[in-house]
C-alpha cells in the first residue's frame, strides 16, 4: 500500500477503495518496523486509529471530506498538541504534556488530517544532524552510517522512509531544508509570518517558522495552503492574502524565467559532485528557456557569524523559562532555590543547547552588546537590502542546499564550527525572512542525496513551488 502523492491516496479513499483505518494501520506497522531508527519520539497508535474510524464514518454518512482528508502526517516534537508529550527532544521536557494545540495543528485537524506521532529532532531545534537529541540520533534513510540532517531530521526521515506522507518541521536557519536535501525529499520554509508560530516552542523568535516536508511539491503546497494565514494568537503572523498555490504552480512557465546564480554559492570548497549536479540542473533549465543571471551577494561570508550571534542571543532569552520551577525536569540534588535552578538546567539541557545559551548570554552582556549583537543586527539589515535588490532583477536565486552530501554520524560533533557550516547556504533566507525550498536533484556517485536550494521574494511561495515542481518532474 504505497502512495506516490496525496492525490493518489485521496482518490482511493473517496472512492471507498480503501479506508482511513487501513491506511493508518499500514503506516503504524511501518513505524513499528523502523522503531530502532528513533524516528518517532511518540507514536499516537490508539489516537490515530480512533481518528481514522471517525473520518471513515464521516465519509460513509455523506459528509464532505476536508482538504487533507485522511492524510497521515508526522509532527516535529517542538509543535504543541494538546494532552500529548512535547519534549523538544530534551531531558528537561521529557515528560511534559502540552495543555493546548498549536494553531497549525488545529488548522490541519479541521482539514481532516490524521496525526501519526511526534518526530525526533535536535534538542530545542539546535543542530544540523539530529545528533543532539536526548532520545538518540536518527540514521539517514539511504545510509544508516550517516545523518539525516537537522534539526527536523526525524520529520525528514519519516517522509523518506514512508512512515508519514507529509511532516511538519520548524526552520530557524535551514532545519527543514537541509534535512530535506539529505533525505531526497522536498522541504519548504515559507515567508516569515506566513504560518502562525503559536504553539511552536521558541528557539529564535524572529527566525523561527513552521515548514513542510513531503515527497512532492503538490502535497507541500496543499498543506501550506491549509496552515497559512493570519492568527490572532501570533502577532508576527501576516495578513498578506493566502494565494491559490495550486493555480500559481500550474501556470508557471520556465521559459523566460530569470534565475539568479550567485558566485558566492559556488566556492572552491564546495563538494565537487554537489557543484556538478547543481550546475547541471541550471544548464538544463537554461536549455528549457530560462535565463541564468549572475548575481553578486558580497556579504555572504558574514551570514553564519551574524546568524549564530542573533539566534543564540534570542535562545538565551527564550530558554530562560525552563528553570525547573514551573514545569519540566527538576533536579533533586539541590540544597536551595538557586542551586535548583542551576542544577535543573545543567542536568536537563544537552551540551549544544548549553553552548548556545552561554554564547547568547555573552553577546548580550553589557561589554559586548554593541560589538557583537548590534553589529549582527546591522548585518541582517544589509542582507535584507542585498536580497531585495537581487530579487528585483531575477525571479529566483538558486544554489546548493548544503555544501556537502550527508556526512557520517559523529564526523562533526566534536567541531561545532564545522557543523554550523552545514547551513551556510540556507541561513541567508532565514536572515532576510524570504521563502526558500530544497528540491531533490538525485544521487551522487556514492548514492547519497543532493538537494538544490531556491529562494524567492516575500510571499512568492506559489512561484517557488512551481519552479521546484518543474525541476522535480524533469528528473
From Swiss-Prot:
Record lineage: Bacteria, Pseudomonadati, Chlorobiota, Chlorobiia, Chlorobiales
Catalytic activity: L-glutamyl-tRNA(Gln) + L-glutamine + ATP + H2O = L-glutaminyl-tRNA(Gln) + L-glutamate + ADP + phosphate + H(+)
Species per Swiss-Prot/TrEMBL record: Pelodictyon phaeoclathratiforme (strain DSM 5477 / BU-1)
Gene designation per UniProt: gatA
InterPro entries, sorted: Amidase (IPR000120), Amidase_CS (IPR020556), Amidase_dom (IPR023631), AS_sf (IPR036928), GatA (IPR004412)
EC number(s) recorded for this UniProt protein: 6.3.5.7
One annotated GO molecular function: ATP binding
A Pfam match: Amidase
Similarity field: Belongs to the amidase family. GatA subfamily.
Subunit: Heterotrimer of A, B and C subunits.
Listed GO biological process terms: translation
Record has Iron as a keyword: no
Name listed for the protein in its UniProt record: Glutamyl-tRNA(Gln) amidotransferase subunit A
Catalytic residue positions: 76 (charge relay system), 151 (charge relay system), 175 (acyl-ester intermediate)
Entry function: Allows the formation of correctly charged Gln-tRNA(Gln) through the transamidation of misacylated Glu-tRNA(Gln) in organisms which lack glutaminyl-tRNA synthetase. The reaction takes place in the presence of glutamine and ATP through an activated gamma-phospho-Glu-tRNA(Gln).
Keyword Protein biosynthesis listed: yes
EC category: ligase
Any one cellular-component term (Gene Ontology): glutamyl-tRNA(Gln) amidotransferase complex
Keywords of the record: ATP-binding, Ligase, Nucleotide-binding, Protein biosynthesis
Amino acid at each position: 500500500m504505497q502512495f506516490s502523492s496525496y492525490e493518489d491516496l485521496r482518490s482511493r479513499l473517496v472512492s471507498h477503495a480503501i479506508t482511513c483505518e487501513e491506511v493508518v494501520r499500514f503506516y503504524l506497522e511501518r513505524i513499528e518496523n523502523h522503531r530502532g531508527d528513533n524516528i518517532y519520539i511518540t507514536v499516537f497508535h490508539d489516537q490515530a486509529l480512533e481518528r481514522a474510524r471517525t473520518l471513515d464514518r464521516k465519509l460513509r454518512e455523506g459528509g464532505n471530506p476536508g482538504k487533507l482528508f485522511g492524510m497521515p502526517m508526522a509532527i516535529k516534537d517542538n509543535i504543541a498538541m494538546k494532552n500529548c508529550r512535547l519534549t523538544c527532544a530534551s531531558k528537561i521536557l521529557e515528560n511534559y504534556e502540552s495543555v493546548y494545540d498549536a494553531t497549525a495543528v488545529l488548522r490541519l485537524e479541521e482539514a481532516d488530517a490524521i496525526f501519526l506521532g511526534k518526530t525526533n529532532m535536535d534538542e530545542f531545534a539546535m543542530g544540523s544532524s539530529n545528533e543532539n537529541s536526548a532520545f538518540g540520533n536518527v540514521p539517514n534513510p539511504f545510509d544508516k552510517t550517516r545523518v539525516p540532517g537537522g534539526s527536523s531530521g526525524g520529520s525528514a526521515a519519516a517522509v523518506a522512509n514512508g512512515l508519514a506522507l507529509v511532516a511538519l518541521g520548524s526552520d530557524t536557519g535551514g532545519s527543514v531544508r537541509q534535512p530535506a536535501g539529505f533525505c531526497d525529499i522536498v522541504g519548504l520554509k515559507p515567508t516569515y509570518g506566513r504560518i502562525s508560530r503559536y504553539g511552536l516552542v521558541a528557539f529564535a523568535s524572529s527566525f523561527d517558522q513552521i515548514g513542510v516536508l513531503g515527497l512532492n511539491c503538490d502535497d507541500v503546497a496543499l498543506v501550506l495552503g491549509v496552515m497559512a494565514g493570519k492568527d490572532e494568537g501570533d502577532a508576527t503572523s501576516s495578513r498578506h492574502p493566502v494565494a491559490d498555490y495550486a493555480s500559481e504552480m500550474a501556470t508557471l512557465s520556465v521559459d523566460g524565467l530569470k534565475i539568479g546564480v550567485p558566485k558566492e554559492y559556488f566556492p572552491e570548497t564546495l563538494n565537487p559532485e554537489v557543484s556538478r549536479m547543481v550546475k547541471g540542473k541550471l544548464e538544463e533549465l537554461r536549455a528549457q528557456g530560462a535565463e541564468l543571471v549572475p548575481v553578486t551577494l558580497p556579504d555572504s561570508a558574514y551570514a553564519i557569524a551574524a546568524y549564530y550571534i542573533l539566534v543564540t542571543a534570542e535562545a538565551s532569552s527564550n530558554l530562560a523559562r525552563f528553570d525547573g520551577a514551573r514545569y519540566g525536569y527538576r533536579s533533586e540534588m539541590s540544597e536551595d532555590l538557586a542551586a535548583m535552578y542551576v542544577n535543573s538546567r545543567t542536568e536537563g539541557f544537552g551540551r549544544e543547547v548549553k553552548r548556545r545559551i552561554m554564547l547568547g548570554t555573552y553577546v548580550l552582556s553589557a561589554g559586548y552588546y554593541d560589538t557583537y549583537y548590534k553589529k549582527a543586527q546591522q548585518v541582517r539589515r544589509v542582507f535584507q537590502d542585498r536580497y531585495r535588490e537581487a530579487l528585483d532583477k531575477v525571479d529566483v536565486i538558486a544554489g546548493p542546499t548544503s555544501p556537502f552530501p550527508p556526512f557520517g554520524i559523529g564526523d562533526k560533533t566534536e567541531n561545532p564550527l564545522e557543523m554550523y557550516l552545514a547551513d551556510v547556504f540556507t541561513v541567508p533566507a532565514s536572515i532576510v525572512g524570504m521563502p526558500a525550498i530544497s528540491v531533490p536533484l538525485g544521487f551522487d556517485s556514492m548514492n547519497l542525496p543532493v538537494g538544490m536550494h531556491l529562494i524567492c521574494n516575500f510571499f512568492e511561495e506559489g512561484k517557488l513551488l512551481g519552479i521546484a515542481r518543474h525541476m522535480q518532474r524533469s528528473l
